[in-house]
């Protein structure tokens, strides 16, 4: 049995995810994962490269974990531009494209004939994988492949905590997925914002007493410029997590002073 699934069974009625103001327990999440695993039977083979279209949602998180258990190579794609989606599907050598529409799982065959050697290596080891794309700010976005089993197992044995954490970074961002895995491994609650504007995020921080904010210097600047921090009580915040704050330490100091 998988250690993460064992943890979900133990967490049981604790709130795992709040999506669109609706609360889902760890039992709800486990039930949805099992539902998707049943849907994948005979339709998605182990080791196939599978894209998930869409951003964070209760359903997409359950689908991500179902594909992880099915030992697939997973490609989260949050873009809504058809040309960009098509390019990423081709670049990642995707076999299937999955989308949840009105709670119904839609599976589309892409029949990719070629596979990169790094994908073959994961398939030969019977490991799940994760393919993410660079931002493309300095040119064409580059595909990066990760061993998803290793990413998940990094969080094994973490101490259980009762805290609310905001899932801010995108579904196709390594920082966002690390945040999600950390939350679920410790039995905490992941709160998905309706959108990522400064007002909405500050409102959530106040409402759910958020203590940890995964963010970026750009977004912290937006909060300061919009003065959303003056409309809401952000005193619950204890930590700001970012890959880039070491280069923006003065900004972090300014934010702490508000």
PLM regions and their residue ranges:
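Flexible, low-complexity linker/hinge segments
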Residues: 102-128, 145
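Conserved AMP-binding/adenylation subdomain of ANL enzymes
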Residues: 152-164, 172-212, 226
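Conserved AMP-binding/adenylate-forming
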Residues: 22, 38-80, 170
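Conserved adenylate-forming
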Residues: 193-258
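Conserved AMP-binding A3 loop
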Residues: 25-26, 127-156
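Conserved S/T- and glycine-rich ATP-binding loop of Class I adenylate-forming
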Residues: 50, 67, 128, 134-137, ...
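Conserved AMP-binding/adenylate-forming core of the ANL superfamily
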Residues: 5, 13-44, 83-86
